[in-house]
Amino acid sequence: MSEVQQVRSEQVVGTVTPWAKRRDPSFDFLKGFLVVVMVVHHTLEYFVGPDYWLIRYVDFVTGGFVFAAGFLPALLLQSNPGGNRQKTCARLFARGVKLLLLFVILNILLGFLLEKSPGGKQFGVSQFFRNLYPIFLYGDKSLVAFAILVPIAYTLIALAILLQARHVRSVVAITALGLVTFCTLSSGWSFNLYYLSMGLAGGAAGMLVNPRLMGSSVRPGIKALLWAGAAVYMVSITFLRHDNAVLYAAGIFCVLGCAYTSVRAFEPETLWFQYHVVLGQYSLLGYLGQILFLQMLRRGHISALHWTLGLIPFLLTCVFLGGMSVGLDFLRKRNVTIDLAYRSVFA
């Protein structure tokens, strides 16, 4: 056993996440799918236009990241009822805090390096610290980059608290339903609150779904309902000027359910499958990397990048993300320092 493999083995034994020993490649595929769809979303936004009509059909991806952040730990926790729940919740809480710290560090670095993004967003260290209240309470996207990291972090922290409740399923479901309903009926919700509701909706779904009926075990009737729900969602956003939190959460659940159950049923050992799996294993880094890479291309002001609906920057970004993920995975398997450094930030 290599040095890195031994350290990883000790880390797995030292945690209460036995699912890490039997990592589901279909979950990684699902997260990789979200990264690729996010590349589509940002490519259209940066190189075609923020109001381009196709963007509405991939807009589920923003909430999808937060939904998955709540769904996966909740599902995996209930699939291991004999585990140490307090330690698992402590790990979720710590990961949420690390995401908040990562968000702060990234925005401070951008404040030092850039004055303005290609889209006109102002950056500055003093501006960031002057606006901590609206940034962390409301989620003002005009003031920061990587704003979605905050509701993802809040989702993990909230679940770390809620999952310790005695009647955990009821508590998570009622909390999620109340928050989604509030965001649907009220106009007073903020960016952070809206996407926190998506994260808790994912947590509720993860607690209510039977893990033994996932993937290839899902009945054909359930798969048909997921596809029908995804179709209804896509048709609805075609005719509605604005969707609502209930429709958005249901649409995310159906679209991600379709992606997961379809891949899980076949699990083809093909290059495209393995590509999405490795992207999913580094989904957070992939999310950050694709934004930075696309912004770099955007700052180049190369007219050819705007041709064919941004196909060229999309392909370049996909190649970059694949190379980054495979390269990092290669290095982590061979160098314990790199592996521990990655885990200290992203795991």
What is each residue range found by the language model?
Residues 2-347:
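Alpha-helical transmembrane segments and their immediate juxtamembrane cytosolic regions
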